[in-house]
Amino acid sequence: GKRCSGSIPYGYNRLPNDKQTLDELSSFFRLPILFDGENIEIKKETAPKLEQTGIYLGQTNNGLSAFIDASSFKKHAFICGVPGSGKTNTMLHLANSLWHHKKLIKDDTDNLSVTFKEESDPIPFLVLEPAKREYRELSRYDIPELIILSPSASTKFPMRLNPFEFPKGLTLSEHISKLCQVFEGAFPIAPPAPFILDKAIEGIYRAHGWNTNDINTGEKEYPTMSELYDRFQKELSQTTYDSEIQGNIQSVLEMRIGSLLRREMKDIFDVKHSTFSPEEWLKHPVIVELESLGEGPANFVTLLLCTLIRETLKASPRADEEKVVRHIIFIEEAHNLIAPEAQVASGQDSNPKIAATAYIVKMLAEVRALREGIIIADQLPTAMAPEVIKNTNIKLIHRLTSIDDRQLIGSTMSASGIQLEHVAVYRPGEALMSYEGLQRPFELRIQEQKGHGSETPNDDELYDIMLHKPAFFQLAQKEENLRVWDYPNKHFATQKWRLYIRTPCLPQQCVLFVRSLKFLDWRKTPCQPWNGSVKIKS
């Protein structure tokens, strides 16, 4: 037959159009190449889940609504960003959304098909704010059950906290062990002082009829901080340490425990009964402002409240079984408590921050099974121990300018180099988010809270706002635990009564208020204008 000039038979040197060799096809196939910042309008691996229930976060770059299931917070969250990047707005949004959380339940009224309806499922929270007073902005939101505690001199929102009060159903031995860790995490206490502290704590309980293996039933009396001070001194005097060691331990007593008994600290810690019982901390949304206390006492309160909540959850693990999350703790400005390393120091080099960090890391691992979530917020990831960041499921990054910070947090959430470059130029509210189930993080803009950015209320304004919240009235009934109702003179009491009577309230609550002020009677109904005709007991 006919042949071409080569060795291939004529007609075979060209295949039909529908058959091509790989070499021929390769010239027509190219993978898409994107310039930085470009994207293809197809579903990406970084796209968030498209559920329409749970906690609403905000809008993605593609205009999609981003939600996250509330159960994800059981595995904790870490939020970071430089000042002004929108971190506080994010925390306020999460707190408000958690309290207004709704869950889907089966609608039994429809017998023909399986349908679901929304049901209110508020998740209580505790905000521990060591600096500033920005979270009091939540008082302007629709949270009637909100409680704000701001322990300081002449405060209108006092807090009483007896460290020796612990949950019902828990053994005394376990509480003593945890309480010693709280002291070591808040104050520098070098050996052998921790041993004497442990012995002194056990001694004051025994003086009230406790045994270490007792389970708390709520019937026995709790000791106080001043009793611990005296007992510590007694235990120290019975040791055989030389005078120098005894002098060092005496300094620990004066500087650490003694500091909790001076001025307003005495009103906070040296009390028989706390503002809340351990169980009540799990029922309310609470903000505790710690700015006025100083670093040591503030860290002591933070660790103590975390301990009480953990103990309460452990003592009643089956309570609120219908809730996927029982409670959330917000730890703001975490660098005040948490160190860049979590290795516990020993000996004379004892560092309370390292001890506190180890305590928080351990708590992150333990409370997940108890349906407790912890949200840790700080400006810089490098200020946190790596174990803290690694043990959190949800990671949310606002603007970070330092490459070290971006690389550290980015390595824990599989962020690409391009994504981390974008983080450095984020505008306020923009964030990079990752959680379990995503291959890569995605960008979004967090929902801006209404009113955020306006000036937070001062003490007088906040007091007026809180008077309208039922939870504040309930707290007022605990007269012996709240200085806000312990007026120093009749004139001041009368002024407070005038302020109180201007607010809408329930008559029964007003009666309790009047009795607490020891008024003999009052001539007008509580919510009518007051004409001054109130007789005060002489």
Residue ranges and their predicted role:
Residues 83, 93-96, 167, 348, ...:
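Conserved ATP-driven motor cores of ASCE-family P-loop NTPases powering translocation/secretion/packaging/pilus
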Residues 75-76, 86-87, 133-136, 231, ...:
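Flexible loop/turn segments at secondary-structure boundaries
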Residues 1-48, 418-474:
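Phosphate-binding and hydrolysis-coupling loops of NTP-dependent motor/remodeling domains
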Residues 1-82, 89-90, 94-96, 101-119, ...:
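Basic- and hydrophobic-enriched, low-structure N-terminal and domain-boundary segments
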